A protein has these predicted regions:
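Intrinsically disordered, low-complexity basic segments at termini and long loops, enriched
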Residues: 1-48
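Domain-level detector for secreted/extracellular nuclease and nuclease-toxin modules, and
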Residues: 32-452
Length: 452
């Protein structure tokens, strides 16, 4: 029988506690030597300690992984109002998954800015800042030692007022040489665009807005106040665009064209609203939602259509993209000019204003369209609505300019609109090539299949 060495159990235990992560060869030699000298009783103790040593190694390796706890924020829970502009990795913040979750590694930074909206606010702030960075400390907690006195809950970050968004005219051109405008935010002299508009500066008409739509857009931030529309300098100093969209202004404008028929068209039920091209809730966070309230993203739209089939299409499409996991590019635009009968029984084009040369501007569109394109599969579809509650069913049918594919396919079960309802807006669908045969607005992109 081998002779036991007294006290070696204590030595081994001490060795484990002092350096549990040691991989030194001498240590392993000592352990092997001691193991060979231990009696049965001490050998059992040694085996137990060896097992503990292994567990300690596993635990300490797990705890020593770099990064620590992640931050996890949700678009419906952790984002308050007035929300700052939020920049991550050099671009405006976007969720990481279809449920609106933002996931950051421990130590990742975000830039918060309230430019044009006062200063940042948080209950833990040490000083006022217009723009500042914060770093993830796990959960919903963020830190900045120069600005915050403790790790601080993200949901409490606010601006004094909503930050200012704006448009800028680019050097890029779109349909028929019109200018491309970008709408977004300026932070520390850097412009961050949310969407772009092809805008006709002669007729003051939004041709289309282009933006992306992803599965997370269905989880847009709620309880975001609607700001006033802004024009920047796009409409010039002469055109009273706010007044023209008001009940009094639109009534005065349309009465010049239809005379005594005005009461049949502009009343408590039928009137023109500011029709969004890119919808407010086509953007997931408050700073994106607010930026849709710009006149380069707007055209006159009959209220029944605005709140009827057009709104239904927006909601259904967001849900469809969410459920199918599509990553899409959307072109939402206008085409043609709607007509009304004047007091002589003749149809006339409807505009809201005439410029200094008596040229009509700000047309009331005949059609609104939404072309949805999925670049990965090169599939697309066009949805069209007639912006005119005063057309009869037969007149509307004559205005359908393509083969209405939604009317005969069960694949569009997810569409809940009422396409044959005049007040809500007669509506139909086309393949993209069929749509292009009539409407030549869109830039070139390859479409090889139908998105449905």
């Amino acid at each position: 029988m081998q002779k036991c060495l007294p006290g070696h159990g204590r030595i081994i235990t001490f060795m484990f506690l002092v350096d549990p992560l040691s991989q030194n060869k001498k240590v392993h030699k000592v352990m092997n030597f001691l193991s060979s000298k231990l009696s049965c009783r001490y050998n059992k103790i040694f085996c137990a300690l060896s097992m503990i040593h292994r567990y300690i190694l596993i635990i300490m390796c797990a705890l020593s992984k770099p990064g620590g706890e992640r931050c996890r924020l949700n678009s419906r829970i952790h984002f308050g109002e007035p929300l700052p502009i939020i920049i991550s990795h050099g671009k405006l913040l976007e969720p990481a998954d279809a449920n609106g979750n933002v996931i950051l590694e421990n130590g990742d930074t975000l830039t918060l800015s309230c430019e044009g909206g006062g200063n940042l606010y948080h209950p833990n702030m040490l000083q006022s800042e217009e723009t500042a960075t914060i770093s993830c400390k796990g959960g919903e907690n963020f830190q900045n030692d120069n600005w915050l006195n403790n790790p601080s809950a993200f949901s409490s970050f606010r601006c004094s007022f909503a930050p200012n968004y704006s448009s800028r005219r680019t050097v890029r051109l779109c349909h028929q040489g019109n200018a491309v405008f970008e709408v977004g935010y300026t932070v520390q002299r850097e412009f961050y665009a949310l969407y772009e508009s092809c805008f006709n500066e002669l007729t003051l008409n939004a041709v289309y807005s282009k933006y992306t739509q992803r599965p997370y857009n269905a989880k847009f931030q709620t309880r975001v106040n609607r700001p006033f529309f802004i024009a920047n300098d796009v409409y010039g100093a002469v055109v009273p665009v706010d007044y023209l969209f008001s009940p009094k202004g639109q009534r005065a404008a349309v009465s010049l064209l239809v005379g005594n028929m005005i009461d049949s068209y502009i009343n408590n039920v039928d009137f023109l609203s500011r029709g969004h091209l890119a919808a407010k809730t086509d953007f997931v966070f408050a700073f994106g939602e607010r930026a849709t309230f710009h006149y380069v993203n707007c055209a006159p739209q009959w209220y029944g259509f605005n709140s009827g089939n057009w709104n239904t299409l927006e909601v259904d499409l967001r849900n469809f993209i969410h459920d199918t996991g599509l990553d899409t590019v959307i072109y939402t635009g206008t085409y043609g000019v709607t007509q009304l009968y004047n007091d002589n029984g003749r149809r006339v084009d409807i505009y809201l204003y005439s410029d200094e040369n008596n040229n009509p501007v700000i047309p009331v569109p005949l059609y609104y369209y939404k072309v949805v394109y999925e670049p990965t599969s090169k599939r697309g579809i066009a949805f069209i609505g007639i912006n005119g509650p005063h057309y009869t069913a037969n007149e509307a049918e004559d205005l359908f300019f393509c083969n209405n594919i939604c009317n005969r396919s069960a694949a569009f079960y997810w569409l809940t609109w009422h396409p044959h309802n005049a007040h809500e807006g007669y509506s139909f669908c086309c393949t993209v090539p069929d749509f292009r045969n009539t409407v030549g607005h869109l830039p070139s992109f390859e479409v090889t299949g139908l998105l449905m």
